[in-house]
């Protein structure tokens, strides 16, 4: 069985006239007398090049695909060339043709009304795609000095430097016209006392640690100097290099050589941040009693990404979910607060819709001070889902509206673990460094020291915001954190904590 037109007739497609090629001109392949290809024959080929061959090919393609206006491939042919530049340049549409809408302004399919989402770019003053962002204080690209910057169709005009920038309202909240950008959050990890050590060599550090623990006695100062000045990422490399070089587990060697709170601090430094947190949570809920403050401290202060990693690591390490662990050891509204925080689903935007902030403040007032009893679920929903920037605005609005700080209202309306938990969440959201400064002060105040809290905060915040915590501590208590650690601890334990602290204020 054969199909019409198949196999193709001899000579290729389309059929060629006798003695000619399928596209016109001389037949292909070339006659046997054609010289071999080489650099010395390029000139010969150029002299034999047949323009009629490709011109015929173009005419045939035009007929095949229905193109009536395909330009001739060679400018010298009659009628060849592209049409002249229309008036106004190629950016103007041809006559009797509708202009092409700009990017982001095409109507949706099916005849639906256009979306209310802003067209590209989504914020005023953004650079034209492909152009670099101008330095601060410099005119955006596309504008002459003294003239407004270029904007896309459908965008509001971009203000000149020094003028106030109009901020769009969030859609979906009627009457919202006051959206203010929050102060950009400090970059994670940019205010720690420990950073990557320059010139880091994990094999050399592994050798230092090996010598410090080899033979009779231990050189604790060498361990402090080495591990207390390396970032967590670098410590993980030291672990691997130690095992590679000596075939031994550095953690086991450290456990066998160290003791007490000094050992606990060094081992805390050697864990990754996520692994350290899940073991702190495990310790907080095991046995008789629960360290509720530890649970709230970790879950209220960590980022969404970190909390999600906590959930994955907890399940992998302990064969049960973090939520199951919380449910097994807590109850009531405090349990609901912890479970809400453990989802890692807080809004992380930095813009504030003031009308929504006012509404949330009114609803918190209606759920607490302005009713008999307290609707704890409303506090839970607002405090665990709204962004940090939004909640700061809510707390300020609550103070303005009621004349009372929201922390005092929580103390009046709640009690026990729930009161402590809600207060910790509010304080952490208001001012995270101040929250940790207060926790450190309480850990060292009075008889005895809450060493687990002291170690946990010093280690977990050492690469995040310990410099800010030191500043808040000095402001709140009139003494430096370094001073109080020196007076409340001793020995190598004091030395490693002061090394992490990073200096006296």
From Swiss-Prot:
Q: Where are the Annexin repeats?
A: 200-271, 272-343, 355-427, 431-502
Keyword Amino-acid biosynthesis recorded: no
A Gene Ontology annotation in the biological process aspect, one of them, is: response to calcium ion
Task: Please list the residue ranges that the record marks as compositionally biased, kind Pro residues.
Answer: 1-17, 99-160
GO MF annotation: an example: calcium-dependent phospholipid binding
Report the outcome of residue 175 to R.
In ALS23; uncertain significance
Where is region (Disordered) located?
A: 1-38, 84-199
The cellular location(s) given in this protein's UniProt record come to: Cytoplasm; Melanosome; Nucleus envelope; Nucleus, Nucleoplasm
Q: Which SMART domains match?
A: ANX (SM00335)
What InterPro entries does the annotation carry?
A: Annexin (IPR001464), Annexin_repeat (IPR018502), Annexin_repeat_CS (IPR018252), Annexin_sf (IPR037104), ANX11 (IPR008157)
According to its UniProt entry, the function of this protein is described as: Binds specifically to calcyclin in a calcium-dependent manner. Required for midbody formation and completion of the terminal phase of cytokinesis.
Which family, according to the similarity comment? Belongs to the annexin family.
Q: Looking at the record, which disorder is this protein connected with?
A: Amyotrophic lateral sclerosis 23: A form of amyotrophic lateral sclerosis, a neurodegenerative disorder affecting upper motor neurons in the brain and lower motor neurons in the brain stem and spinal cord, resulting in fatal paralysis. Sensory abnormalities are absent. The pathologic hallmarks of the disease include pallor of the corticospinal tract due to loss of motor neurons, presence of ubiquitin-positive inclusions within surviving motor neurons, and deposition of pathologic aggregates.
Q: How does it assemble?
A: Interacts with S100A6. Interacts with PDCD6 in a calcium-dependent manner. Interacts with KIF23 during cytokinesis.
**What is recorded about the protein's domains?**
A pair of annexin repeats may form one binding site for calcium and phospholipid.
Kindly provide the name given to this protein in its UniProt entry. Answer: Annexin A11
């Amino acid at each position: 069985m054969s199909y019409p037109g198949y196999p193709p007739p001899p000579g290729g497609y389309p059929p060629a006239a006798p003695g000619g090629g399928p596209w016109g001109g001389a037949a292909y392949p070339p006659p046997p007398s054609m010289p071999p290809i080489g650099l010395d024959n390029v000139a010969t080929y150029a002299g034999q090049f047949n323009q009629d061959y490709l011109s015929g090919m173009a005419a045939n393609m035009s007929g095949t695909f229905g193109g009536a206006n395909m330009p001739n491939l060679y400018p010298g042919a009659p009628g060849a060339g592209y049409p002249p530049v229309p008036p106004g340049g190629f950016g103007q549409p041809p006559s009797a043709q509708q202009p092409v809408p700009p990017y982001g302004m095409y109507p949706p399919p099916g005849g639906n009304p256009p979306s209310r989402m802003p067209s590209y770019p989504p914020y005023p003053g953004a650079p034209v795609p492909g152009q670099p962002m101008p330095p601060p204080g410099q005119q955006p690209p596309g504008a002459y000095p003294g003239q407004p910057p270029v904007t896309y169709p459908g965008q509001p005009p971009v203000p000149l430097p020094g003028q106030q920038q109009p901020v769009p309202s969030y859609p979906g909240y009627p009457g919202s016209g006051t959206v203010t950008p929050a102060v950009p959050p400090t970059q994670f990890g940019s205010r720690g006392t420990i950073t990557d050590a320059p010139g880091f060599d994990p094999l050399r550090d592994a050798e230092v640690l090996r010598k410090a623990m080899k033979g009779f006695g231990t050189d604790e100062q060498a361990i402090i100097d080495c591990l207390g000045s390396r970032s967590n990422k670098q410590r993980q490399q030291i672990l691997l290099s130690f095992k590679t070089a000596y075939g031994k587990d550095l953690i086991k060697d450290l456990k066998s050589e160290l003791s007490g709170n000094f050992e606990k601090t060094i081992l805390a430094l050697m864990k990754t941040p996520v692994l350290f947190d899940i073991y702190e949570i495990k310790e907080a809920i095991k046995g008789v009693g629960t360290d509720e403050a530890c649970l709230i401290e970790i879950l209220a202060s960590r980022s969404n990404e970190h909390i999600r990693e906590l959930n994955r690591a907890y399940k992998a390490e302990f064969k049960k979910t973090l939520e199951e662990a919380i449910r097994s050891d807590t109850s009531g509204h405090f349990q609901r607060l912890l479970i809400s925080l453990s989802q890692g689903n807080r809004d992380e935007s930095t813009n504030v819709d003031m009308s929504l902030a006012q509404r949330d403040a009114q609803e918190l007032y209606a759920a607490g001070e302005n009713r008999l009893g307290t609707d704890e679920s409303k506090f839970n929903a607002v405090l665990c889902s709204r962004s940090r920037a939004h909640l700061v605005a809510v707390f300020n609005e609550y103070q303005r509206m009621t004349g009372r700080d929201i922390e005092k209202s929580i103390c009046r309306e709640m009690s026990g673990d729930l009161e402590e938990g809600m207060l910790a969440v509010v304080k952490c959201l208001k001012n995270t460094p101040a929250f940790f400064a207060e926790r450190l002060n309480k850990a060292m105040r009075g008889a005895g020291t809450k060493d687990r809290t002291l170690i946990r905060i010093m280690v977990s915040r050492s690469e995040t915001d310990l410099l800010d915590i030191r500043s808040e501590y000095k402001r709140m208590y009139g003494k430096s954190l370094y001073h109080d650690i020196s007076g409340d601890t001793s020995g190598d334990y004091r030395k490693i904590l002061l090394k992490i602290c990073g200096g006296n204020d």
